[in-house]
Amino acid sequence: MEPRQELLDPERVREEAKRIVRWLCGLVDRTGKLPAGDYQGKILNTVSEICKRSKLPCGELAEALTKGRLTRSLVDYSELLISNLVVGYFDVLEIYLGKQSVRLSDIREMACKYTFYAINRRLEDYIKFQTAWLQARAMRDVTPEPEAPSWLNEGFGRCFSALLNRKVHLRCVLRARPNDVSLAASLYQVKRVAPPLPDDQIEKNLEKSLDRLTKDEEPAGVDEPFLEDLKRECKRTVDELVQNARREGWNRKISRDCFPSQSAAFENPISKGGQLGQLVKENNTPRLPVLLGMFEYKGRVTPVYGWADDGDTILSDEELGREVPAALKCRRSPVLEPFKVRVITMGPAVQYYRARRVQGCLWDLLKHTRCTHLPNRPVEESDIGFYVRRRGADLFRGEEVPYVSGDYSAATDNLHPDLSLSVVDRVCDHLLSDDNRPLDPVSPWRVLFHRVLVGHRIYDGNSSRNTEVAAQSWGQLMGSPLSFPVLCIVNLAVTRYVLEKACGRIVTLEESGILVNGDDILFRCPERTIPFWTRMVTIAGLSPSPGKNFVSYRYCQLNSELYDMSGSRAEYLPFIKANLIYGTLARGCERKRAADLCYGDTTTEGGTFGHRARALIKGFGPDMQDRLMSRFLHSIKGFLEKIPEVSWFIHPRYGGLGLPLTRPVTHNPYHLRIAAYLSCGGEQSQEARCMMQWLSAPTKSFNAATLLRILEVARNCKVPFRKVPFALLHRAEAAGVDLEALFRKALLRSAPRLGVEYPSNESGDMQRLGDWRRFFRDVGRKAARTRCRSGTADERKGLFLMSPDNAVKGPQYEYIFDWASHNMGGNIWDPSYKFRADPFSSSESDEPRAKEIGPNRGPE
């Protein structure tokens, strides 16, 4: 009788993988040689057996172990990387192939194989190549198979143990059903669990990025006539984008309203306030409150006080100045992602702040054309099922047209500067300055637009000690406020040019069926066109990324999401994002803190545990969702111990974490009472919701004092508090309607000298968690003391507990002040109302008005 297989859990798998790596890498002594004696013979025999089973060259492994290729940093990194990968594959295979499908011998064989490639510094390339090949075969990719790399010592797709290779090959290569495509995509995404690269690899990636940005010559194979065609196509694309946007009411005037970013600047790190901290210097001089204006509402007038008047703020053009240096300084910083380093640049605070005002205008330009509206909202299945499918088929009637899912390598670094400047010049031809003047060739805004994209002086070091390393001569900088919109336009223009050449006629953007989001693109074209598309995007500097481009008749991919196109509509195809299983990783090798993970803005998709858990289980069936949630909760147990004793599953608006519920649970009455309290419309509940909104997203409103001042003005004027459906709020936001108080922007511009409550460090994180605990305890005490105002004495014992279903579902509406109400109820809250550009522009006497006053004069 065979011995019973030992049950494995992720912790046991991780420890076993680490033990194998340490065992192999620990064979050498400090001189880099094998220990002498019989032990050496035993080890060599063991290495020989490992190589035989894994089909690895024994000589290369023994040579790597004996010739001192190992360093302490490499061993430490390899141990962490291999253990993460093995546990990730274990989780995915156990879910798709069934429990106990992975044996302990499989874990050991995989760890040995990965150690061999890690010693030779090829593990990252090996994992990406093998798993990308599996996904391509599962999606029935029609492009020719790539050539085998010289360092690959086994067959394609065989990156697991011998037994698991057979199972995975059967599912992903031979059978290739939708569930098998999901398995292949899940295996490919396991790379997201990789830790940050070691320091020597980071330096190599920084040097590669610098080489790309400082090259002078044209890339080999660039055809000058084609380049001129692409420049004309970029200008034509901008013209059509502007035409579509102006038809929808786009305001081509550069915005005056822009609040400084708190991201790092060249002069100031994020720990010191970033761009905002550089623009608004600390001023400890005692000040009296400054009268910003008088607010009138239904005959009631109340003063609005701030902390600095408009004449004192430095966020004005007069203080910022209009001189643009010939070459802007920028400091580069590595952002660590799985298997790669993304180089982000931090530019000068003044010029980048002004560029952000242009950025808002460009976002509005892109959102009015269907090809480029994805940066403003998430992908919907109708975008692919209707737009891409039908438009692509209409262009090439009578031909079979597959879906082309494109992605590029180092797109911003490699983008041809001539194409970037063509886009910039044409966009500037259509824009108006903040004082309604066209941007002529010597306009400061046009000069600024040019210089925030090209011609930077690149520095290394920190904000106090910088060393110039090179001058930018190619590409764009990832970190420039304007690089992403320009990249979208170039990507769209080049691909549309290819489609026109393929179908032999002029194609409008609406007819093209192209979806673009930065360096991601999805479109349809015949197989005969793929080589020409590859050539054109390469001329533009957009080199297709190996393993991330797919050409399939049934499946497509956009923004790392898969869709099955075999039915009448696009069907979302879920797969496991292994990094989300561990709760602390959404994208890249981030360094999120506990407060950001537990509490965040509930109106937008962010990086909290609730958002990540929903992204993890999205699209799966109930059984799979429950298994994934169990694994998720087990992995984040340490983080949950740091936060107040809040409900895990109650909606964040009612004081919980908002984790998705996949099985029945029993809710604590204490949590249900708090949910009932926060759902009430009383004054204390209003203030509690206001503070909860602030603590969820402290940087979004900048300072809690601004929220409390708005609350004070609303109460003084008795502005009604209304329940507005979320759908209506989203419609208003999409239409560009600001439902906030008219004086909110003036308050924000007055508040920067107050500083931020929570610095971006460990101390600020602990302070924010402490405030959350105090806030939650205070709300709990108030909820316990609250009494009903009607009924008999026995019935007025306190709030009724909210039903568990309603507590989990959350509110269907938002409480906001109705600044625009007419006689306690205006038509702005009617769902059939069509929003105007400014819904508050009515001349009726009972409309709210903000009367501006100067520092030395009274109200007008």
From Swiss-Prot:
UniProt EC number: 2.7.7.48
Segments of skewed composition (Basic and acidic residues): 846-860
Keywords assigned by UniProt, alphabetized: Nucleotide-binding, Nucleotidyltransferase, RNA-directed RNA polymerase, Transferase, Viral RNA replication
Catalytic reactions of this protein: RNA(n) + a ribonucleoside 5'-triphosphate = RNA(n+1) + diphosphate
Disordered, as annotated region: 839-860
Example of a GO MF term: RNA-directed RNA polymerase activity
Class of this enzyme: transferase
Top-level lineage group: Viruses
Family of the protein in this entry: Belongs to the ssRNA positive-strand viruses RNA-directed RNA polymerase family.
Role this protein plays: RNA-dependent RNA polymerase which replicates the viral genome.
Protein name: RNA-dependent RNA polymerase
Origin species: Ourmia melon virus (isolate Melon/Iran/VE9)
